[in-house]
Every structure is written in structure tokens, then in C-alpha cells.
Amino acid sequence: MNGTEGENFYVPMSNKTGVVRNPFEYPQYYLADHWMFAVLAAYMFFLIITGFPVNFLTLFVTIQNKKLRQPLNYILLNLAVANLFMVFGGFTTTLITSMNGYFVFGSTGCNLEGFFATLGGEISLWSLVVLAIERYVVVCKPMSNFRFGSQHAIAGVSLTWVMAMACAAPPLVGWSRYIPEGLQCSCGIDYYTPKPEINNVSFVIYMFVVHFSIPLTIIFFCYGRLVCTVKAAAAQQQESETTQRAEREVTRMVVIMVIGFLICWLPYASVALYIFNNQGSEFGPVFMTIPSFFAKSSALYNPLIYILMNKQFRNCMITTLCCGKNPFEEEESTSASASKTEASSVSSSQVSPA
């Protein structure tokens, strides 16, 4: 084996030289230069000072504006809550460990950090699945006269938490485990060892199938059908001007949604799958560190994509930040009517399928 396995860790370096140390007790500067740990700490600090305000503002603005308390926005708020879980439960911990060069909070802290990071990421992922299904049902109309109400939104939010817990909780109770990964400053699922006594292989397979492949398939299917439906409606010149605008807006949103998801999670999932399929092979600590830390940026991407691109949310945010006045209101007044019609077309199922 080209790594060193301990009771609750796996360091991707052979201990033939005798330099490998427990990542819960000793700095890991033998894995990489000091400046790399400093870069990780700076990156986590950036995610905290940007991710927290944007996600907190999403919650605050929704509470302040009654018109935003719509069923669909329950899911968007769930995304913000999930991202805050990642910020407080994962990012702050990783910032401190990166500054110290090792996981100073011990095995228990590793379990908590891994749990909250996984929970937040999975809530975000399944929230996107619920959004995709809602968009598909409302716009493509596979069921006639369906209206997405509060009960559907609450059920969707509940589903995200159930599925997230089904992924994040098992390693805490003996099915797989959380261990430090990469430069040993953040924790994740053990992809590195078979560990038969905790049935690690079966859990990793379960996680990749149920909590990655299936959600990704659903998202691609729903948004693929949505784009086709909007294009067909536009081609038939149904409500031509607003539908054409809706087509452009929805297409742009879908492209950014898919790209954002893939940019955040596909590199991490691909590297994790490679490591899992090649356990014991030689790879450096940076090999997993970069995609692992890059996946954490989803806490910043999500609100920018799903909240800030929503005109109603954006206007309410500007009004809140500017103490009740929107300085851009006059500039947008000429398109306000069209925007409302567009929102109705896309969000209230007025865009008819072919």
C-alpha cells in the first residue's frame, strides 16, 4: 500500500521513511509546503466572508418581504440553510485546521465536520432535485391543472433532509467512517480503504448510486425536458414576446445550473471514484485536496445562481440593502410589466407544452 492507514485516518504517503504522523496530533507539513496550507486557509476565509452574507441575506430578505414567501421559495430557503450548515459546521473548522496544519479537533471533531459538510452538500443537492422536478411538473405539465403549493414545498424540503441524513448519518453509526483527506485538514467519507469491518465498500457504492448518480440523472432529465418545452412554445409563437424572453431566461438559468453543479461536484466525485477503484495506488495529497475544497464553493455558487438571478429576489435584496429604496427602480420600470408576465409564464405554468 502506498499510504499509511491508522485506526481512524489514512495518509496518502508511505511510512517507509518514518515521517508520517497522526493527522489528529501532529502538523502535516511533510505532505506539502507551508504556503499550501496558508492558501487553503485563505480560501476558506474567502468562502466564509462571502458565503455567509449572501446566504444569510437570502433568509433575512425573505422574512422581511411577504411577497417572497411563496411555496417555491421554501426550497430556495432550504438551499440557503444548507449552505449555512456548510459555512458554520465545515468551513470554520477547516479554516482553523488549515491554519494549524493538521486536524486539531481530533476524531470527534472530524466526525462532526464531515457530517455537517456532507449534510449541507446533500441538502443542497436534493434541493436542486426538488427544484428540477417542480420546474418539470409546472412547465412541462405531465399532470394537468397541477399547482405547486405549500404542502408540496414542505414535502420537498422534508425529502431533502431525509435523503441528506440517509447519506451523512451512517458513517457516525458504523457504516463507513469520516477521516481526514487530502492535506488532512478537512474530513470526508473514506474512499481510500476497503475497511470490511465497517462495510465501507457497500456504503461508497450506495452513496455514488443513490446520492450522486440518481440525483444527477433526475436533474438532467427534468431540465432537458423543460428546455425542449419552452423552445416548442416559442416556436409556435404562443405569447410570442414574453415566451421568447422566457425561453432565453430559462435556457440561461438551466445552463448555469448544470454547469455550476458539474463544476462543483463532478471533479470531487470523479477523483473519489478513481481513488475508490484504485485503493492502495500511489497519489499525492493534493490530488484529493483541490477537488475537495473546490466542491465547497457550491455554498457560494448556489445562492448566486438560484437566488440572485431571480429578478424578484434581486430587487428585494437591493431594496433591503438600500434601506427601503431601490436606486435601480426607474431603470427597470420600463421592463417591469414584461418581467411580471415572464415570471407568470415560467413560474405559474403559463408556458404550454407542444
Swiss-Prot record:
The modification N6-(retinylidene)lysine is found at residue 296. One of its GO terms (molecular function) is G protein-coupled photoreceptor activity. This is Rhodopsin. Residues 334-354 have a biased composition (Low complexity). The record marks 113 as: Plays an important role in the conformation switch to the active conformation. It is found in: Membrane; Cell projection, Cilium, Photoreceptor outer segment. It comes from the Eukaryota. It holds the Pfam family Rhodopsin_N. Photoreceptor required for image-forming vision at low light intensity. While most salt water fish species use retinal as chromophore, most freshwater fish use 3-dehydroretinal, or a mixture of retinal and 3-dehydroretinal. Light-induced isomerization of 11-cis to all-trans retinal triggers a conformational change that activates signaling via G-proteins. Subsequent receptor phosphorylation mediates displacement of the bound G-protein alpha subunit by arrestin and terminates signaling. One of its GO terms (biological process) is absorption of visible light. InterPro entries: GPCR_opsins, GPCR_Rhodpsn, GPCR_Rhodpsn_7TM, Opsin, Retinal_BS, Rhodopsin, Rhodopsin_N. The keyword Membrane applies. GO terms for cellular component: membrane; photoreceptor disc membrane; plasma membrane. Residues 1-36, 97-110, 174-202, 275-286 are extracellular. Phosphorylated on some or all of the serine and threonine residues present in the C-terminal region. Contains one covalently linked retinal chromophore. A motif ('Ionic lock' involved in activated form stabilization) lies at residues 134-136. Disulfide bonds join 110-187. PANTHER family: OPSIN (PTHR24240). Keywords: Cell projection, Chromophore, Disulfide bond, G-protein coupled receptor, Glycoprotein, Lipoprotein, Membrane, Palmitate, Phosphoprotein, Photoreceptor protein, Receptor, Retinal protein, Sensory transduction, Transducer, Transmembrane, Transmembrane helix, Vision.
